[in-house]
């Protein structure tokens, strides 16, 4: 009887050791790049869209959810956005998609924002695809460069950058139109 108990104890211990040996390594594995379409040649796509930040009127596309600490620099303010992306400067031109995300006042001594947004395309070849922009926007500079840190759909594994140029701003209500020239590397 003692031999049977000893034998069972050794078996249980052995099973416990074997079953726990791979616990830390089973969550990740090397994959074939072809399974994700990464065997294709990488492409560089350039496109230009116009971002309409509307703070005024009955249907604003930018809503301040946290007011600034002071009025002088916008520091500490956070605004959520669902801004139209159009093919041309006028807001009534063809809508290509939406810029969805937020911007936050991140500079104390200048008008500087942390931008975190997805450009979600809703028409044509890129319908359902997105690019993700995360970067610093010094809004009073003529040209602002921000990185593209990812994407989805046809922009899966995207990287690149955007150049933002303000085309129009209403200093009374804050409404603005900004040209985004996008340079995207993707498969």
Curated annotation (Swiss-Prot):
Carbohydrate attachment residues: 71, 92, 127
Which region is the signal sequence? Answer: 1-20
| Any Pfam family matching the protein | Dirigent
Keyword hit for tRNA processing: no
Query: Where in the cell is the protein located?
Result: Secreted, Extracellular space, Apoplast
Coiled coil (residue ranges) = none
Return the GO cellular component terms, semicolon-separated: apoplast
What keywords are annotated for this sequence in UniProt?
Apoplast, Glycoprotein, Secreted, Signal
Q: Output the GO biological process annotations, alphabetical, semicolon-separated.
A: phenylpropanoid biosynthetic process
Q: Does the keyword ATP-binding apply?
A: no
**Summary of subunit composition and partner proteins:** Homodimer.
The similarity comment for this entry is:
Belongs to the plant dirigent protein family.
Query: What's this chain's function?
Result: Dirigent proteins impart stereoselectivity on the phenoxy radical-coupling reaction, yielding optically active lignans from two molecules of coniferyl alcohol in the biosynthesis of lignans, flavonolignans, and alkaloids and thus plays a central role in plant secondary metabolism.
Q: What is this protein called?
A: Dirigent protein 20
> What is the scientific name of the source organism?
Arabidopsis thaliana
Gene name per UniProt: DIR20
